[in-house]
Amino acid sequence: MKEITTTQQFEQEVLNSANPVFVDFWAEWCGPCKAVSPAVEELSGEYKDKVDFVKVNVDQNNELAQKYNIFSIPTLAIFKDGKVIAQSAGAASKESIRTYINKNIQTEASA
């Protein structure tokens, strides 16, 4: 899963992507973020070629966090055609995240 480190990279990888993009807004010090991370990593493999997955460290990318109103973490957002189409804050199970993705992009994982 790709780590976004600049606003320019976010534009390229997320806003200009042909695929829907799942964005994990997180921070190093955040316990719930660390709890969600393995599930997000596994799902990124299941959805490859259908959904792009990226991580944004809110401490290193404060401007992006402010722009997208990230007030609590983890926040899991889905972007499509350069716009946020779904956003959910808080830790969630792998199954909950899978349901969230399927509901918002109308696709099933190949796994």
Where are each of the predicted segments found?
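A short beta-strand-turn-helix
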Residues: E3-P20
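Acidic phosphotransfer microenvironment of two-component signaling modules
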Residues: Q8-E11, N62-E63, E95
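Conserved helix-turn-beta segment immediately C-terminal to the redox Cys motif
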Residues: A18-P20, S37-V56
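Conserved redox-active cysteine motifs that mediate thiol-disulfide chemistry
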Residues: F25-A39
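Structural microenvironment flanking redox-active thiols in thiol-disulfide oxidoreductases
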Residues: V56-A65
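Non-catalytic, surface beta->alpha helical segment in thiol-disulfide oxidoreductase systems
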Residues: S72, I78-S110
